[in-house]
């Protein structure tokens, strides 16, 4: 029998779904992200939400100031900004974002789906022209894939979304087209907003990323979709099921949205990751102050940036597919977003260590995912190309 590998080298990963928060929290979140990743797609659900290119650029400036203050070298981390899509986002904002070079995607939150999502989209028909402009300018759409109606069980919100809503977002499954100067983004060839084909026909080439998929239905949807559709998966949804959050007591630091699912769902995610190059890393690292998690109405989100690659390595090794880790973390995402993979390399070394019970977070602390437990892999310094 072969001895297990003592170390594993891979191209520097990126994170295609990351929450840094704002203000004093950046002193913790930015250097942690920069240690793990070269680039990260930064979520826009601040208060107020990042709804314009100018707001995204101002937020990026604050992130880079925090990076500099941490002592990290300039250029060691590239925050790729996103804009929060609302019912009133004009098509002109897509053009401004695309031309800025700072904004890499727009984020669609169904109103009320997760933290700070009250300003999210209430009806896809209201953003048809904006989605058309995104396809025209090659701007991807990141989607939080859950329904939010009160009659749907929280554990079924993603299942219902993929059974009833997801197809309305999909474009013709062809490669991203060259922008057509004669394309009219306000023209809708199917005027009935209640029919899914309206969006399929009106936004050809739109690239869609279904973020943090958690169910067998979500995994199957991405597997069966065309080349313009991708998915991301978090470390917690690969490692544990809902028992970890609920059995033997409620563990608020395991609570995230989409919520942890069944063991059957977890295994379906692992199998999809094993076979599909359009599924890639997206930690959804989402820190909250300890007091906002440990109370009678705690916030959703797991903070995983402190050990993201170590957590993914554990999940991949347990699933017997460590050889797929580099594709998932380092090459699948850049290929879908149309950017070059990183040339620097990192090493994960087999080394047992204990995750701290808490980490600084502004004037309080954040409890990281797997706090107080032992991990078997540890990230080493970056290597030259």
Residue ranges of predicted features:
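His/Asp/Glu-enriched, well-ordered alpha-helical/loop segment
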Residues: 202, 274-341
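Histidine/acidic residue-rich metal-binding segments in metalloenzymes
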Residues: 93-107, 116-175, 182-281
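Mid-to-C-terminal alpha-helical segments outside catalytic/metal-binding sites
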Residues: 309-384
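Histidine-centered catalytic micro-motifs
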Residues: 12-23, 141-147, 233, 285
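Divalent metal-dependent hydrolysis catalytic cores, especially in the metallo-beta-lactamase
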Residues: 15-16, 29-54, 68-86, 102-116, ...
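Eukaryotic N-terminal low-complexity, Ser/Thr- and Lys/Arg-rich leader segments
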Residues: 1-7, 178-180, 184-187, 382-385
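Short, acidic/polar
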Residues: 23-30, 88-98
């Amino acid at each position: 029998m072969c001895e297990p590998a003592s170390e594993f080298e891979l191209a520097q990963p990126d994170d295609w779904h990351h929450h840094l928060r704002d203000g004093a929290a950046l002193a913790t979140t930015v250097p942690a992200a920069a240690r793990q990743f070269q680039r990260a797609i930064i979520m826009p659900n601040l208060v107020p939400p990042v709804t314009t290119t100018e707001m995204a650029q101002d937020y990026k400036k604050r992130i880079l100031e925090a990076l500099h203050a941490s002592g990290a070298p300039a250029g060691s981390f590239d925050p790729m900004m996103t804009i929060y899509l609302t019912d009133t986002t004009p098509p002109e904002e897509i053009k401004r974002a695309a031309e800025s070079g700072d904004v890499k995607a727009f984020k669609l939150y169904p109103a009320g789906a997760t933290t700070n999502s009250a300003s999210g989209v209430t009806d896809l028909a209201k953003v048809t022209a904006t989605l058309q402009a995104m396809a025209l300018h090659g701007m991807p759409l990141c989607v939080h894939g859950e329904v939010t109606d009160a009659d749907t069980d929280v554990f079924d919100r993603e299942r219902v979304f993929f059974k009833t809503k997801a197809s309305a977002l999909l474009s013709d499954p062809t490669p991203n087209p060259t922008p057509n100067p004669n394309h009219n983004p306000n023209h809708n060839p199917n005027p009935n907003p209640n029919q899914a084909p309206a969006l399929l026909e009106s936004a050809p080439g739109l690239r869609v990323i279904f973020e943090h998929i958690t169910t067998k239905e979500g995994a199957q949807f991405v597997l069966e979709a065309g080349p313009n559709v991708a998915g991301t998966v978090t470390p917690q949804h690969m490692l544990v099921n809902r028992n970890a959050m609920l059995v033997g007591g409620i563990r608020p630091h395991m609570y995230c949205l989409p919520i942890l699912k069944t063991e059957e769902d977890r295994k379906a995610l692992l199998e999809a990751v094993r076979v599909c190059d359009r599924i890639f890393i997206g930690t959804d690292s989402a820190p909250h102050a300890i007091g906002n998690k440990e109370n009678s109405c705690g916030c959703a989100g797991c903070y995983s940036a402190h050990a993201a690659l170590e957590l993914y390595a554990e999940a991949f090794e347990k699933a017997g597919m460590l050889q797929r880790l580099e594709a998932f973390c380092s090459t699948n995402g850049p290929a879908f977003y149309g950017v070059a993979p990183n040339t620097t390399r990192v090493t994960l070394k087999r080394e047992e260590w204990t995750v701290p019970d808490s980490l600084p977070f502004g004037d309080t602390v954040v409890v990281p995912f797997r706090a107080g437990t032992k991990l078997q892999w540890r990230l080493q310094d970056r290597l030259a190309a």
